[in-house]
Amino acid sequence: CTYLFAIAPHNRAVSAFESSAAQVRDKNSALQEEIDAAQHALDAGEAPLDVGTQDALTVAIANARLSLRVIPDMPSSTSDIESLNQPLDYSANSQALQETKAAFENSVRQLRQVTAPSQDFVISRLGQVSDVSDIQAATEEKDPNKSLNKAGSYTAAVFFHYNNLSDPDGLYSGKPSIDNGTDGGGCIEVFRTVEDANKRNDYLAVFDGASIINPGSHKVVGTVVIRTSHLLTASQQDALTAEIEAGLTAVD
């Protein structure tokens, strides 16, 4: 009777615990590999375009580490052993790690693309934006601002015409975009560093809303300043800026 009602159930519980412990070790090991891979992505030290992706990955790693089940020493009582044989599912943690790691790595690639990109890259991506035409790059001989390649200034300035620009007097139609300047549509300015791009953006902001010298909209993306004409409506500026940014940051 003692064997049937005490020893046998205990032995079964012990066997189940050992089997469960082996499964936990395997699942812990698999999740730990994903944690290590995610941590390695962070430890590489590359910054993302969207810092939120880095924060999300950091949280996912922390949550995954907290979820790892600790395998204790074998309890003595049957009831305690059975209480440890609970189902273990790391699928939610695994999915969170995979998704946040992919988003972070994609954002890192995006920032690389908009960090001192080549003039050819900017022209190529700008050419994919709807209603943009007459794309022209400034040269040292022909640059409206006379600033190309100077210390702290842009290394490329790519002007363009925007087909939806309201131009009732025909001031900009039929003229080269580089002659129209930003007023005729917009311009993409490329800088060597984020600091230089931000300085340029801050300078332009001084003239925001001015009636005579109005820089239009301007936004820093990486080391690029996206500018659109002040003659566009606010919604047109926002939509065009967003489409240009999407084109520059699209990862193949």
What residue spans do the PLM features occupy?
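Second-shell loop/turn segments in exported
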Residues: 109-113, 185-190, 225-233
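Stable alpha-helical elements in mature extracytoplasmic
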Residues: 93, 118, 122-125, 196-203, ...
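Solvent-exposed, charged interface segments at domain starts and junctions
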Residues: 79-82, 86, 110-145
